[in-house]
Amino acid sequence: MAPYIMIVEFLCLWSSVSAVNCPFFVFYDAITSLLGFSIIWKPKEKVTIMAEAADFVKNKINNGTYSVANKHKGKSVIWSILCDILKEDETVLDGWLFCRQCQKVLKFLHKNTSNLSRHKCCLTLRRPTELKIVSENDKKVAIEKCTQWVVQDCRPFSAVTGAGFKNLVKFFLQIGAIYGEQVDVDDLLPDPTTLSRKAKSDAEEKRSLISSEIKKAVDSGRASATVDMWTDQYVQRNFLGITFHYEKEFKLCDMILGLKSMNFQKSTAENILMKIKGLFSEFNVENIDNVKFVTDRGANIKKALEGNTRLNCSSHLLSNVLEKSFNEANELKKIVKSCKKIVKYCKKSNLQHTLETTLKSACPTRWNSNYKMMKSILDNWRSVDKILGEADIHVDFNKSSLKVVVDILGDFERIFKKLQTSSSPSICFVLPSISKILELCEPNILDLSAAALLKERILENIRKIWMANLSIWHKAAFFLYPPAAHLQEEDILEIKVFCISQIQVPISYTLSLESTETPRTPETPETPETPETPETPETPETPETPETPESLESPNLFPKKNKTISSENEFFFPKPVTESNSNFNESPLDEIERYIRQRVPLSQNFEVIEWWKNNANLYPQLSKLALKLLSIPASSAELKECFP
């Protein structure tokens, strides 16, 4: 009898070699025929076997091991809903696709789309059945004309892929179909000045359309914004950018408000505030007192916004933690320096093409780029090691030490992504992120020296830098994530007081305090335009020195759990409530007490905005506060994507 392995073992084995882009069927044939293994499963049809493999890939997507690409490069209409699946190293998983409509994993081999076209979601797509097929000769002429255009007019080659360019070509085809070839091109094309005026008028028209919406969000206290600055190193010119965030009809909305040059002025607090107010005034917003700002800890920005509610950018704080941790440990500092040396040598020597994947460069303003750089070297270690040997280049680390650092920082990358998202609430994940990092950095007797040193420095710096700069806004946002409402027992009184101060209509509320220290219950504000934080300043003046030893302890939000993660929610909430409790023994007088007593289970696909939408009638005032807080981004990192 031939050797055998179980189906689960087989799938795990295939997953381990999928990093080299080995399709499922190729690996299956190799195992069964070349190695003489038999796969033990119940006699099933091939469709059932493939379904098990598809479920295996789908689980990897659900737990965050795999991700879904934005778009597949293809001309067929099916690629509007089908996309590639990316592995941990961001390379494409060969042999599988993901359907955005039904959320299913589909097999895809040898670029054959016939089976994909029969997928139920693809059958519903409108197909351009009346389009004519262009001959190969005409395609060659099109290539020639496009090449001449990009060369003569100095356009990027990617210009032909733009949606605007394609719309322009379609328009010209329609003109040709109506008038034929006898058309004066110069008469059809507009003058550059006409284009400029048209673009300006369109911009003014769209600006007027969104100005009323922006002003309404600001006046109602539902608006927040991120502010960041960037320097053009070539001309030594500073720029300031602002993104605008708000909630509308239970949906999070965000937009780039604008980028402004400092016009070679010094980036003083006065000049920064003037630019910020100038950008808002372009949208008819003259008073920005109600806007909550998320920024880094730059002294000039802090001074400029001292009259506003300002929260620290969580991604920036986490970056500071990691940067300081590496700089304080010579062994870790040498690893980063050596990795930068390797990337620089490979690029200057034109050796990138000899590697399986491209080496990533580190960006000084984006600390998680260091992780991507180290991981890209680890993924290409065999080739990199060979290159270093041939060039007689010595580095201050080995593969083992690099791997342990990359493994630790892998979960940090996941946290970075969660904090930097703007399409879904992120501020409620700030406290869970800290708790998760404290768990990940717990000392282990089996840790190598590099791992132990990194964990030690992170634990110390996260308490000094990040935990010391938390505000009541972060605690309240976490409190308003229903499955976690009961997890901040020590801070619950402070959170209650803050929530009541932020609710803009009177509610019946009675505080029964058993503590010897009784804080003053703030009165309901008469004007809804002044959201203040009465209890806790958002940014301590001396964040490097914690107040008491107790402030250095973990928030203890979650119990310890093994590192087997089955979903993104479980990554941040290891032990959530699993049973609902909406029946109470007594009837509290206010929404907050009623909300605290309720136990909301955390499902795998729990959506916090959707929950508040469904419970808006039960919590009419608290739901408005929740949406206002949850629309605040945790990070200003998204704005950096606007900068070159």
UniProtKB/Swiss-Prot annotation:
One Pfam family for this entry, by name? DBD_Tnp_Hermes
Which GO MF terms are attached to this record?
A: DNA binding; protein dimerization activity; zinc ion binding
| 10 X 3 AA tandem repeats of T-P-E: annotated span | 521-550
Gene Ontology BP terms: DNA integration; DNA recombination
In this chain the sequence repeats are located at 521-523, 524-526, 527-529, 530-532, 533-535, 536-538, 539-541, 542-544, 545-547, 548-550
- Which residue stretches belong to region Disordered? 514-560
Cellular component GO terms, alphabetical: nucleus
Which of UniProt's keywords are assigned here?
DNA integration, DNA recombination, DNA-binding, Metal-binding, Nucleus, Repeat, Transposable element, Zinc, Zinc-finger
Q: Where in the cell is it found?
A: Nucleus
Q: Where are the zinc fingers (BED-type)?
A: 73-131
Family matches, as PANTHER family: DNA REPLICATION-RELATED ELEMENT FACTOR, ISOFORM A
Instruction: Give the protein's function.
Output: Essential for hobo transposase activity.
This protein's name: Transposable element Hobo transposase
Originating organism: Drosophila melanogaster (Fruit fly)
Name the gene behind this protein.
Answer: T
